[in-house]
């Protein structure tokens, strides 16, 4: 078969199909009174034999076409299949569904509402059989009062299997204990014991203090307990040991050059409040009475230290051999430096800041003592402070601030300071 023959055959088939289609459209437009479908059956038996003659005329003259009949536009929209009409009308019926809106349980209707009502009347569902067999009833879950019990949540959330308790974390165990109304403090072992129904720590009897002392003490309470029990006895023992140490004859301080046979009266109360560098406190006269005619070794040492501080020019042997008399009192230590501290109004001796460092000594009458020995000691002490001759023997010399502290011949300033014994 050549190409021209195949194209001619396809053209004939196409023209035949077109003629049959035009014929059926023409018959449907002409039969306006009948409601039958022209695609299913013919309108009359007279037109049936004419069907095979029409394609024959087209085969003879394929290019000739029959004139198109008049078209009725008002007839076309009424010819619709009942299936198509139902298909397009069904979405309109389903469009009023309100499944996306929330409806309270009181307003629900239909089979779903009835199912929910039945579930609420039956109560919560029972746990499965395997869960019933593996779980034990918890003693804490029993109602202790006869009041109305609250509805219990689902059992699969609260109750846990005994074999799976060790696999839970501490946070999960505490959450379960909170839901059951149990305390959540403690270690994981304590939490597991509470979950299994053991005795909670609230109900355990508190151990007595005797039991605690018999057992190993807690390290945080051990120092405090020992400190409170040993404090009074330690203080009393230490005070007694110190008194015995200074009053004993084998004390190393007893070899001091101070003679113990020198009679001396009891010191006056003015000597008691003076500060001493020795760390040993003075013994109280009430528990250990001393004879009024002699001084104790500790008092003699304190008096020697005080005299050595106030009289730096004297030798230590002279101070120790000197007899202490009640009327022979040493002058008190002055709290202020000799000189005027008024910086605004200059003194008659000098002007400006030099008046602060000038040695304007007080009058001799203010520093006099009842004893001539005390007067001589005070004059020597003032001479040592001022670095010049005694009072009344000449013009005042340079003060202690202008003295050469590095001069070994003069009295040094740090000799006045109390040295540790």
From Swiss-Prot:
Example of a GO cellular component annotation carried by this entry: nucleus
The protein's name in its UniProt record: MEF2-activating motif and SAP domain-containing transcriptional regulator
Report the record's Gene Ontology biological process terms.
positive regulation of myotube differentiation; positive regulation of transcription by RNA polymerase II
Q: Where is the composition biased (Pro residues)?
A: 260-292
Mark out the compositionally biased spans (Polar residues).
230-241
Task: Quote the subcellular location field of this record.
Answer: Nucleus
Q: SAP domain location, by residue?
A: 165-199
């Amino acid at each position: 078969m050549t190409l021209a023959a195949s194209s001619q055959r396809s053209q004939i088939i196409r023209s035949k199909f077109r003629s049959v289609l035009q014929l059926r459209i023409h018959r449907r437009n002409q039969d306006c009174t009948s409601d039958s479908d022209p695609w299913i059956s013919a309108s009359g038996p007279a037109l049936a034999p004419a069907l095979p003659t029409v394609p024959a005329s087209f085969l003879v003259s394929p290019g000739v076409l029959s004139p198109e009949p008049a078209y009725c536009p008002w007839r076309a929209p009424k010819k619709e299949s009942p299936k198509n009409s139902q298909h397009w009308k069904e979405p309109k019926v389903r469009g009023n569904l309100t499944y996306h809106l929330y409806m309270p349980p009181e307003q629900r209707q239909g089979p779903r509402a009835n199912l929910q009502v039945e579930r609420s009347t039956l109560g919560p569902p029972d746990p499965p059989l395997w869960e019933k067999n593996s779980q034990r009833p918890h003693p804490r879950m029993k109602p202790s009062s006869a009041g109305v019990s609250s509805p219990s949540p689902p059992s699969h959330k609260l109750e846990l299997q005994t074999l799976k308790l060790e696999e839970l974390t501490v946070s999960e165990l505490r959450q379960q204990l909170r839901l059951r109304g149990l305390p959540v403090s403690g270690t994981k072992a304590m939490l597991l014991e509470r979950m299994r129904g053991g005795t909670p720590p609230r109900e355990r009897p508190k151990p007595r203090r005797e039991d605690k002392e018999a057992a190993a003490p807690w390290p945080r309470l051990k120092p405090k307990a020992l400190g409170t029990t040993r404090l009074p006895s330690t203080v009393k023992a230490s005070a007694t040991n110190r008194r015995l140490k200074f009053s004993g004859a084998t004390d190393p301080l007893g070899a001091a050059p101070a003679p113990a046979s020198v009679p001396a009266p009891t010191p006056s109360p003015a000597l008691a409040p003076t500060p001493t560098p020795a760390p040993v406190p003075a013994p109280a006269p009430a528990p250990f009475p001393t004879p009024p005619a002699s001084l104790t070794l500790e008092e003699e040492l304190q008096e020697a230290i005080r005299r050595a501080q106030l009289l730096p020019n004297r030798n230590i042997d002279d101070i120790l051999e000197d007899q202490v008399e009640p009327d022979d009192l040493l002058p008190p230590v002055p709290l202020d430096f000799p000189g005027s501290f008024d910086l605004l109004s200059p003194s008659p001796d000098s002007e400006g800041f030099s008046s602060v460092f000038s040695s304007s000594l007080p009058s001799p009458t203010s520093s006099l003592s009842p004893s001539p020995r005390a007067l001589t000691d005070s004059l020597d002490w003032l001479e040592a402070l001022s670095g010049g001759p005694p009072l009344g023997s000449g013009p005042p010399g340079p003060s202690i601030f202008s003295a050469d502290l590095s001069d070994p011949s003069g009295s040094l300033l740090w000799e006045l300071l109390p040295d540790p014994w």
